[in-house]
UniProtKB/Swiss-Prot annotation:
This is Polymerase delta-interacting protein 3. The modification Phosphothreonine is found at residue 140. Is involved in regulation of translation. Is preferentially associated with CBC-bound spliced mRNA-protein complexes during the pioneer round of mRNA translation. Contributes to enhanced translational efficiency of spliced over nonspliced mRNAs. Recruits activated ribosomal protein S6 kinase beta-1 I/RPS6KB1 to newly synthesized mRNA. Involved in nuclear mRNA export; probably mediated by association with the TREX complex. It comes from Homo sapiens (Human). The gene is POLDIP3. It is found in: Nucleus; Nucleus speckle; Cytoplasm. Residues 370-379 have a biased composition (Basic and acidic residues). SMART domains: RRM. It holds the Pfam family RRM_1. Transmembrane segments: none annotated.
């Protein structure tokens, strides 16, 4: 039997069923017999219209369950999970990140009111009665106001006086006595009452020689809130102090005037000491000419607190972080990252070394403790190196210590081990 298409099979079955129904032409009226003849004549036209009206593929397409459920092709899911598209979505230009952050910060925020200390001082001066007479039964804690005079290290090589001297002054402000002027020669009995505030002056070097007739001078103090003020005195120069004295913490101050003279010592040439207060500097090169200083500040302030950030000239910027860890984080985040289509080249200045953009592996080496020990070693050995010359180390000794061997042949003795179970 030859292969028959589905359309022909349906057509033959339909024709056979109609032939069986109309097999007895004598039964029925005239209209039925006329209808048989007309049906036989128009059978060919009916099959053509039937073929046009019905197609099995149309019926399958209408009742397809996949269309109702919304089943997607598995290849589309694979394309969505492709790692290359994820990488393209995550890596973006730093300018896009700046723009998105600016859009997020367009919401108006209430300006934070920063209270000036001078306003508080004036308010406190205008109403001293509230502070002079504290309520009975309450204990007022001792508030300390410290003023530090910072001496620049650059002028440390020019001592003014051959005998450096130290001076410590402690002045007690007693609100119950309602006095603002105190003499330094005042007896201890006059200030035996409980102090509510305490002010400390710390000075070093030849400052004592400029204070002639200090006992007759008087110090005026105002009623102020607890406040720490750092004043840079460029006019004051002091002799260089050893590193051990420089880093030594100040001890408790007494109420007496202490004058301590030290014998002059010949100090070695002072090395530049990297203070943590200076921060960690990072320079950014290869910037687009349209990058401004505001862009630099907004870009790097995300990584941590900035000491300063400025545009040296178009294409080069300088950023100084307060903490070293923040500078390392910014270096790892923005080194060789594109800003306005140009990769940023970051150079990190740390521990006296410069880590360029092509040497990120030096970050791991610069933070190792061995580097710190090597940098601190010359400072400790300076005093001893002048008297004793450095000892020469034999390379055979180093080989023997490291590999238990040397250049020459060494006789090895067998080692016996006794193990008790």
């Amino acid at each position: 039997m030859a292969d028959i298409s589905l359309d022909e099979l349906i057509r033959k079955r339909g024709a056979a069923a109609k032939g069986r129904l109309n097999a007895r032409p004598g039964v029925g009226g005239v209209r039925s017999r006329v209808g048989i003849q007309q049906g036989l004549l128009s059978q060919s036209t009916r099959t053509a219209t039937f073929q046009q009206r019905f197609d099995a593929r149309q019926k399958i397409g209408l009742s397809d369950a996949r269309l109702k459920l919304g089943v997607k092709d598995a290849r589309e899911k694979l394309l969505q999970k492709d790692a290359r598209f994820r990488i393209k979505g995550k890596v973006q230009d730093a300018r896009e990140m700046l723009n998105s952050r600016k859009q997020q910060t367009t919401v108006p925020q209430k300006p934070r009111q920063v209270a000036d200390a001078r306003e508080k001082i004036s308010l406190k001066r205008s109403s001293p009665a509230a502070f002079i007479n504290p309520p009975i039964g309450t204990v007022t804690p001792a508030l300390k106001l410290t003023k530090t005079i910072q001496v620049p290290q650059q002028k440390a090589m020019a001592p003014l006086h051959p005998h450096p001297a130290g001076m410590r002054i402690n002045v007690v402000n007693n609100h119950q006595a309602k006095q603002n002027l105190y003499d330094l020669d005042e007896d201890d009995d006059g200030i035996a009452s409980v102090p509510t505030k305490q002010m400390k002056f710390a000075a070093s070097g030849g400052f004592l020689h400029h204070m002639a007739g200090l006992s007759s001078s008087k110090l005026s103090m105002s009623k102020a809130l607890p406040l720490t003020k750092v004043v840079q005195n460029d006019a004051y120069t002091a002799p260089a102090l050893p590193s051990s004295i420089r880093t030594k913490a100040l001890t408790n101050m007494s109420r007496t005037l202490v004058n301590k003279e030290e014998p002059p010592k010949e100090l070695p040439a002072a090395e530049p000491v990297l203070s943590p207060l200076e921060g960690t500097k990072m320079t950014v090169n290869n910037l687009h000419p349209r990058v401004t200083e505001e862009d630099i500040v907004e870009l790097f302030c995300v990584c941590g607190a900035l000491k300063r950030a400025r545009l040296v000239h178009p294409g080069v910027a300088e950023v100084v972080f307060v903490k070293k860890d923040d500078a390392i984080t910014a270096y790892k985040k923005y080194n060789n990252r594109c800003l306005d289509g140009q990769p940023m080249k970051c150079n990190l200045h740390m521990n006296g070394n410069v880590i360029t953009s092509d040497q990120p592996i030096l970050l791991r080496l610069s933070d190792s403790p061995s580097m710190k020990k090597e940098s601190e070693l010359p400072r400790r050995v300076n005093s001893a190196s002048s008297s004793n010359p450095p000892a020469e180390v034999d390379p055979d000794t180093i080989l023997k210590a490291l590999f238990k061997s040397s250049g020459a042949s060494v006789t090895t003795q067998p080692t016996e081990f006794k193990i008790k179970l």
